[in-house]
């Protein structure tokens, strides 16, 4: 599973939050949040934390395979 940079950026912009604020909402440190975003592949649990931070579903921020 990979988080789409473009989809995440849109979700973050729509939320009006900073990365630090999104990390706080997700219950993890800003450093850990950023590290997850920079990974090539993420676990479903990590994707869930990232999505929770910006208030969207996982489906809204992951890259889909066609």
Residue ranges and their predicted role:
Residues 1-21, 63:
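A short, Lys/Arg-rich alpha-helix, primarily the initiator
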Residues 9, 34-35, 48, 62:
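Key DNA-contacting residues within the recognition helix of helix-turn-helix
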Residues 21-23, 50:
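Short alpha-helical "recognition helix" segments of helix-turn-helix
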Residues 39-52:
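Short, basic-rich loop-to-helix N-cap that marks the start of a DNA-contacting helix
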Residues 55-66:
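Short C-terminal boundary/hinge segments that cap the last helix of small helical domains
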